[in-house]
């Protein structure tokens, strides 16, 4: 009897997790972005974005406009960066395809992002590097995730709370 | 609700739900008020815009392989009042002085920023600068601007406390030419 | 003669609480006094009241907070007002006040032998 209960509880947990996963992936499909919701990690866009703010991305625009805030990932560096488009150019490739090249800069940074880009590139490629443009914003809600990943006391505290709650509900 | 823990859970659950609803209502009200305020035609007075160019040879100024790259700088006068954009949901305004010039590739051409500024409060929304120097030394993907004609305009971005970001442009563009090479 | 002892599960928490024990033992021996005091239990009418207070107060607080912020042109007032309403509701609903315990449940008298029929 006990094992069955445990299995049912496990099944419920699996249902909750897979529903959340489906929602996340579905949102990624709609917005055409790998990570449609991001948490701001650095202060490079202050005073507009603070650490812990939540950004909603949209990636279905063919071209990014100047002044848009984009989230991009440089090839080879796994950290996504949220900065504003300073300059945009369009060039044609050898195979007649039009690429959009972008130069970005964080509002709170003194210089543009040239030093952050891949070694030989002077610009970002809209199709390859940009994860999406920021369309909507929610303040401070994501600060919990930052606390958990960076603060070891918060991590222990959360684990303690979770352990406590599983113990108490089972009586 | 019979247990303290249950009451805490139920209360925080409901509070969170209502908070989210409040955010959504604020967002919708912001969209409606932006639409009603006719923020698409705020006048701006751009005058005495002068673009100057010189050649640079370092990578931080766009030079590739040591070849000379034409860099440009701007000098301008600007007079505008962006106070109508400041509502209860405005966190900051980001304004950019943008030059748009034709390229052989696209209809709308390339867009570059010469100067930007952040306005955080309504009392600073009145911008009046004379002989202002641009912040950035701007270069094109090609080696030179080749004396093209550019349209210089002022774009703004409204950052809300919660909701959608709004973008717009002031009324008052000016045509300038890059100096001939 | 079979005598069926029927009981209705009012709250699932009550039922899962004592799953390991015999199904009727909860009625004959509820939680000891000290434990239920720590849990902050309140009776059903009190739960209804607490539920109504949270829903009405928080909804009202949301509307007031929105108006305060909108009319004073400052969104921070919305945040502060709504936080204040949240704290007010929490202080009214979470502690087990005596006005939540006005209608206690009357349990059936304890029997010396309980006849269980499969």
From Swiss-Prot, chain A:
Any one of the GO CC terms: signal peptidase complex
The broad enzyme category this protein falls into is hydrolase
The EC number on file is: 3.4.21.89
Highest taxon in the source lineage: Eukaryota
Q: Where in the cell is it found?
A: Endoplasmic reticulum membrane
Active-site residues, Swiss-Prot/TrEMBL: 44 (charge relay system), 83 (charge relay system), 113 (charge relay system)
Assigned protein family = Belongs to the peptidase S26B family.
Say what the protein does: Catalytic component of the signal peptidase complex (SPC) which catalyzes the cleavage of N-terminal signal sequences from nascent proteins as they are translocated into the lumen of the endoplasmic reticulum. Specifically cleaves N-terminal signal peptides that contain a hydrophobic alpha-helix (h-region) shorter than 18-20 amino acids.
Q: What is this protein called?
A: Signal peptidase complex catalytic subunit SEC11
Q: Which gene encodes it?
A: SEC11
């Amino acid at each position: 009897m006990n094992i069955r209960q445990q299995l049912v509880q496990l099944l419920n947990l699996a249902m909750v997790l897979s529903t959340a996963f489906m929602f996340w992936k579905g949102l990624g499909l709609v917005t055409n972005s790998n990570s449609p919701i991001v948490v701001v990690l650095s202060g490079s866009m202050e005073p507009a974005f603070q650490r812990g703010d939540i950004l909603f991305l949209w990636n279905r625009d063919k071209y990014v406009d100047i002044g848009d805030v984009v989230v991009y990932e440089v090839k080879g560096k796994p950290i996504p960066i949220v900065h504003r488009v300073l300059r945009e150019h369009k060039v044609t490739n050898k195979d007649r395809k039009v690429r959009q090249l972008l130069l970005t800069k964080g509002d709170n940074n003194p210089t543009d992002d040239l030093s952050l880009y891949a070694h030989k590139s002077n610009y970002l490629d809209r199709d390859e590097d940009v994860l999406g443009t920021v369309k909507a914003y929610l303040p401070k809600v994501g600060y919990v995730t930052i606390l958990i990943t960076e603060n070891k006391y918060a991590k222990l505290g959360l684990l303690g709370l979770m352990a406590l709650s599983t113990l108490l509900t089972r009586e | 609700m019979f247990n303290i823990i249950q009451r805490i859970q139920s209360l925080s659950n409901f509070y969170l739900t209502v908070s989210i609803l409040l955010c959504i209502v604020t967002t919708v009200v912001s969209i409606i008020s932006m639409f009603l305020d006719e923020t698409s035609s705020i006048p701006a007075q751009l005058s005495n815009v002068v673009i100057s160019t010189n050649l640079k040879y370092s990578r931080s100024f766009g030079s590739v392989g040591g070849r000379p790259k034409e860099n440009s700088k701007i000098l301008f006068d600007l007079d505008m009042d962006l106070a109508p954009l400041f509502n209860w949901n405005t966190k900051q305004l980001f304004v950019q002085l943008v030059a748009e010039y034709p390229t052989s590739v696209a209809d709308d051409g390339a867009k570059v920023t010469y100067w930007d500024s952040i306005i955080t409060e309504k009392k600073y929304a009145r911008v009046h600068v004379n002989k202002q120097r641009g912040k950035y030394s701007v270069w094109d993907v090609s080696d030179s601007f080749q004396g093209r004609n550019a349209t210089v305009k002022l774009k703004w971005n409204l950052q809300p406390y919660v909701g959608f970001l709004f973008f717009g442009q002031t009324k008052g563009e000016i045509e300038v030419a890059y100096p001939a090479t | 003669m079979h005598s069926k002892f029927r009981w209705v599960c009012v709250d699932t928490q009550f039922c899962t609480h004592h799953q390991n024990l015999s199904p009727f033992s909860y009625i004959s021996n509820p939680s000891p006094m000290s434990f239920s005091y720590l849990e902050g239990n309140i009776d059903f009418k009190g739960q209804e009241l607490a539920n109504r207070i949270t829903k009405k107060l928080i909804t009202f607080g949301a509307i007031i907070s929105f108006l305060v912020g909108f009319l004073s042109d400052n969104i921070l007032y919305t945040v502060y007002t709504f936080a204040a309403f949240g704290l007010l509701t929490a202080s009214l609903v979470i502690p087990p006040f005596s006005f939540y315990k006005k209608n206690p449940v009357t349990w059936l008298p304890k029997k010396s032998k309980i006849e269980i029929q499969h």
